[in-house]
Amino acid sequence: MIFDSKKIYEDKVPSWIQNFLKSKQITIIPKAALMLSEFLGNDLSKIANELNKLEIVVGSDKQVTPEIIEENIGISKDFNNFELQKAIGNLDHKKAYQIVNYFAQNHKQHPFVLTISILYMYFTKLMTLHTVSDKSPAAVSKALGVNPYFVSEYITVSKNFPMKRISGVLETLRVYDSKSKGVGANLGPRDLYYELIYNILK
């Protein structure tokens, strides 16, 4: 199956991946779909190419897992932006710093601007969650544009981040986005990541 280089909104990519594989009678764990979308971006031809390779790898198992992604595409299942937002959401300082330390050591594969963008989308969704009166999985999934699989996680995290705290986090992300571009600071990757996590979790 061949696609042109059409691009879609990044938050729609995991669903596109699931549907593409479903057409081949292959399922994918939601976390694995997120890992792929984070790593490959939103270029559908590029994504389709990698998924066609995975079709050969999974064989008769017919399921793509984070482990398969890690082994065959080279994305760490433990050190990625999905795991970082999860660690931050759960206020797991140790795990968050472990992940950004890995990012800083491999900053070409983990550009700071991508982490900022993903965290901004994550906290924007958490802000939206606070405005949703119907907290049923279906309603939250639709309002946030996330797989129902992740709804309970968002609801749990929202208790750690009330609206006022989220507003502060979003402002912090804007500040460090500017700093990463040399505005008001000239910090290396490690310092940027460490300062960012400190200011989000303080």
Give the predicted meaning of each segment.
Residues 1-202:
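Conserved beta/loop motifs at nucleotide-recognition and modification sites
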